């Protein structure tokens, strides 16, 4: 079913919405009586990005629970955000994880879905953005897929298909030091084309400067030509608004960076958004866990160490992760409950290089995540109530280790996004921070903010 209802035939997704409506409120229910027809499911490829989106939506007055399990229980909402660990795992597993959320009860009533990679579409030549986009297109029957990378507010942009990171072409930026996704090709159209057999075409910033009608005609031409995916430049805020609006009005799968996904969701739910009272932080002992190696976090740890103790682990020692964590617990014992402290899996880039030489980039990352996951469970058992976690993959390992299924994000504030509190009994507060974001004193300020 591919034609519109104007022709007397419903689309595949309209059929899905009718079935959801009849299952929940019975046949014949009016569209404006059913909030689910306007609901949006946003599936992010890491936990910090998922939380960032949830916080932006909360700041816009839209209740947006964040789930880490496909069947997590959440209150009725206009938008549900899901955090996965799909960025760096094997492509087939990443696709499977996304499908679990598509089919899970947490966002099973959503009528539109967005897959949200990082703002710079961090990935490898083999995936996982292309495979997920192909899967979503196949499941919905919608083609071509729309793709849009960029975050102009923080100087992450795309122009003529090329990715610029903080004002520099990505291969000349600090992004080139990323141990898992260094993005060796700045041409995202060419780079993404390695991840899919369906082809990637470009709608450039120059195209969008010629106006909506020109862009709509180009989309139509590319679609008629059989384009599998259409990539849109996001060079500035005007590009961002236009592509989000075009996606909201289309019947296309959308693969979108943080601010584009937020703009899309706001366009879909409009004035019907469900709002709820803001959450409150939990007071209690705090710990900082750092698994990222970005230069930014090194400066942040240096500022933190001027006030609180910091331990840097050596992942290259012959001990297994449990033994490394046990040694760290001995060091932390005198601090737990008495003062904040931080544990990092490296001191500097040289530590990272040694770990990579010993275990490979993926192996070293998984070793670090395992150690920090063990420590998170131990600290939680000993009464830690506030966790500050740096790094998207690290955040995923800590949240998973703690068995957290759902959180409520706090609206964006003076320190930006990243704050949340778990739902259910015995809550804890968390600050999940992307490794490359924040001022030098953000860890210290976050501690004060979470009181």
Give residue ranges: language-model regions:
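Conserved, well-ordered active-site substructure
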Residues: 384-385, 393-442
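N-terminal signal-anchor module of multipass membrane proteins
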Residues: 38-61
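C-terminal structural cap/anchor segments
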Residues: 339-390
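Short acidic, glycine/serine/threonine-rich loops at helix termini
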Residues: 53-55, 125-129, 156-165, 214-215, ...
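N-terminal glycine-rich anion-binding loops that anchor highly charged ligand groups
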Residues: 62-83
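Conserved, well-structured core segments that form the ligand-binding/active-site neighborhood
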Residues: 166-329
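Cap/lid and interdomain-hinge subdomains that line or gate substrate/regulatory clefts
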Residues: 36-41, 63, 67-68, 94, ...
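Short glycine-rich or small-residue beta-strand-to-loop segments that form or flank ligand, phosphate
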Residues: 39-44, 80-88, 111-122, 233, ...
């Amino acid at each position: 079913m591919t034609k519109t209802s104007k022709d007397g035939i419903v689309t595949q997704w309209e059929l899905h919405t009718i079935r959801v409506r009849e299952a929940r409120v019975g046949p014949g229910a009016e569209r404006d009586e059913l909030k689910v027809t306007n609901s949006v499911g946003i599936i992010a490829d890491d936990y910090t990005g998922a939380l960032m989106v949830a916080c932006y939506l909360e700041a816009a007055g839209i209740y947006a629970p964040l789930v880490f399990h496909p069947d997590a229980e959440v209150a009725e909402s206009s938008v549900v955000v899901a955090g996965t660990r799909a960025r760096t795992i094997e492509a087939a597993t990443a696709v499977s994880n996304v499908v679990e959320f598509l089919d899970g009860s947490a966002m099973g009533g959503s009528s539109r879905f967005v897959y949200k990679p990082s703002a710079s579409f961090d990935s490898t030549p083999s995936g996982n953005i292309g495979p997920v986009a192909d899967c979503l297109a196949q499941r919905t029957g919608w083609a071509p897929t729309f793709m849009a990378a960029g975050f102009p507010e923080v100087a992450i942009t795309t122009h003529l298909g090329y990715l610029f990171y903080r004002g520099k072409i990505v291969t000349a930026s600090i992004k080139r030091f990323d141990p898992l996704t260094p993005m060796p090709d700045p041409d995202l159209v060419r780079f993404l084309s390695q991840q899919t057999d369906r082809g990637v075409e470009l709608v450039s910033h120059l195209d969008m400067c010629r106006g909506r009608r020109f862009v709509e005609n180009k989309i139509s031409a590319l679609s008629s030509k059989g384009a599998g995916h259409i990539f849109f430049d996001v060079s500035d805020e005007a590009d961002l608004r236009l592509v989000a609006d075009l996606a909201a009005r289309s019947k296309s799968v959308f693969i979108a960076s943080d601010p584009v996904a937020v703009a899309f969701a706001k366009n879909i739910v409009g004035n019907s958004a469900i709002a709820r009272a803001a959450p409150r932080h939990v007071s209690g002992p705090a710990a900082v866990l750092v698994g990222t190696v970005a230069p930014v976090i090194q400066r942040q740890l240096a500022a933190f160490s001027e006030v609180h103790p910091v331990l840097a682990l050596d992942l290259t020692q012959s001990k297994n992760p449990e033994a490394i964590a046990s040694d760290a617990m001995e060091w932390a014992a005198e601090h737990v409950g008495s003062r904040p402290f931080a544990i990092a899996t490296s001191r500097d880039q040289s530590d990272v290089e040694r770990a990579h030489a010993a275990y490979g980039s993926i192996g070293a990352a998984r070793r670090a995540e395992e150690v920090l996951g063990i420590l998170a469970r131990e600290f939680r058992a000993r009464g830690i109530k506030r966790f500050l976690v740096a790094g998207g993959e690290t955040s995923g390992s800590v949240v998973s280790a703690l068995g957290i299924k759902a959180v409520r994000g706090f609206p964006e504030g003076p320190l930006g996004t990243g704050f949340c509190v778990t739902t259910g009994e015995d809550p804890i507060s968390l600050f999940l921070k992307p490794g490359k974001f924040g001022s030098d004193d953000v860890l210290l300020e976050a501690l004060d903010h979470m009181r």
